[in-house]
Structure formats: C-alpha cells, structure tokens
Amino acid sequence: MKNILIVTGGSGGHVVPSTSLFEHLKNKFSVKMVSDLRGSKYINTEKFKYELIDVPNLFLKPYLLPINIFKYFLNIFQSIKFLKNNKTNIVISTGGYMTFPFCLAAFILQKKVFLFEPNSVLGRSNRFALKFSTK
C-alpha cells in the first residue's frame, strides 16, 4: 500500500481542501496529514489524525530572517527524517509556506511530489515546488 503525505498550509483555504482530499484517499492508501499550528484550528481532531510542524514564515519579521533561515533548513532535515520514518511514497502539497520543506525533502529522497493549488493564484511555495514536482 502506498503511503501518502498531505502537507497543508495554515489557512482554511489550504486545510479544508486537504481534509476533503484525505477523505477521498484514505480508503485506498495509507494517508497522513501535516499542518502548522495555524491550520490545526480548521482540522477536526476527532476525524483526522495529523502532525503539527512548526515552520517559520521567512518574510513575516525581517529582523528574524537569519534565525528563520536557519530554522527553515532544520525543517528540511526534519522533513527528510519524517518522510523516511513514515516510508512516504508520495507528497501532496496544497500550498502554504510550511509545505515547501516537505516538497524539497521529497525531491531529495526521489519521492513523487504532487501540487494541488486550491486558490485561484499559485502561491509562492507551490510556485517554487513546481520546478521539481511530478504533477
């Protein structure tokens, strides 16, 4: 059985489509979901099992940029470890800055990356991940 990881940003526009996708895939695949603290308020914890990951927003506070860049690189290594530990075959990103470390980690590990953009405009994270995505 394929192991699929759905990574989603913290807004309702990212999380709600992710939960629908989770529901659709859960009967045929082993599916996990990852979001950040902002996204947790949109996820029904009784219905969905998910992991919380803290990824800094690089552009929110410019004076924290050096620290946040360091944390971002740590997140990439944590994402690699997460994908290996969970034997993930496919990563599906619905966008949001917290999804990029997982997309990059999947690319490094030669896993398939699928992008699902629920918004009318392609976001920055999915735009960068487009370079190494499968679809």
Language-model segments: residues:
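Conserved nucleotide-sugar phosphate-binding/catalytic loop shared by glycosyltransferases and other
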Residues: 4-9, 28-71
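Residue-level detector of alpha-helix initiation sites
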Residues: 12, 16, 96-98, 120-124
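Short amphipathic alpha-helix
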Residues: 14-25, 38
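Short, well-ordered alpha-helix to beta-strand connector turns
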Residues: 29, 47, 88, 133-134
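Active-site-proximal region of nucleotide-activated glycan assembly enzymes
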Residues: 30-32, 38, 109-135
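An aromatic- and histidine-rich active-site surface loop
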Residues: 39-41, 90-109
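Short beta->alpha connector loops at strand-helix junctions that form conserved
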Residues: 52-57, 94, 116-119
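An amphipathic, basic-hydrophobic alpha-helix
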Residues: 61-90, 100, 108
